[in-house]
Amino acid sequence: MARIAGVDLPRNKRIEIAITYIFGIGRSNGAEVLRKANVNPATRVRDLTEEEVSRIREIVEREYRVEGDLRREIQMNIKRLMDIGCYRGLRHRKGMPVRGQRTRTNARTRRGRRGQAIGIKKKTVKK
């Protein structure tokens, strides 16, 4: 199993799909990496030579910020927004949508589950 940037790539998938398992590399970046490494995108991961894997690994480590470094950078950017107190930072702090979506209805993904509905419970009828 090929290991690139700390991620084990699935052996049975084509390399163009398997490389997207690395956080920070999508389809277009993956295709660019394979082009630079001179690797056929249709090749299965199990059929890659050690030399091809090392070329891909070197390009990813040299030119892309991936996995832990990218996650850390994203978290630091959000923390910076919250620290300076801008509108986007306040929305992050409140757990609300940041990009202008409506919140009167919807926005459940960002706001979480609804609370318990307060209502009248039906009484059981004794016979």
From Swiss-Prot:
Note whether rRNA-binding occurs among the keywords: yes
User: Which Pfam family, just one, is annotated for this protein?
Assistant: Ribosomal_S13
GO terms under biological process: translation
So where does this one cross the membrane? none
The chain's coiled-coil residues are none
Query: Which UniProt keywords are present, listed alphabetically?
Result: Ribonucleoprotein, Ribosomal protein, RNA-binding, rRNA-binding, tRNA-binding
Q: Which GO terms describe its molecular function?
A: rRNA binding; structural constituent of ribosome; tRNA binding
A GO cellular component term found in this entry reads: small ribosomal subunit
Main function: Located at the top of the head of the 30S subunit, it contacts several helices of the 16S rRNA. In the 70S ribosome it contacts the 23S rRNA (bridge B1a) and protein L5 of the 50S subunit (bridge B1b), connecting the 2 subunits; these bridges are implicated in subunit movement. Contacts the tRNAs in the A and P-sites.
Please describe the quaternary structure of this protein. Part of the 30S ribosomal subunit. Forms a loose heterodimer with protein S19. Forms two bridges to the 50S subunit in the 70S ribosome.
Tell me the PANTHER family matching this sequence: 30S RIBOSOMAL PROTEIN S13/40S RIBOSOMAL PROTEIN S18 (PTHR10871), SMALL RIBOSOMAL SUBUNIT PROTEIN US13M (PTHR10871:SF1)
Q: What is the similarity comment for this entry?
A: Belongs to the universal ribosomal protein uS13 family.
UniProt protein name: Small ribosomal subunit protein uS13
Q: Which gene encodes it?
A: rpsM
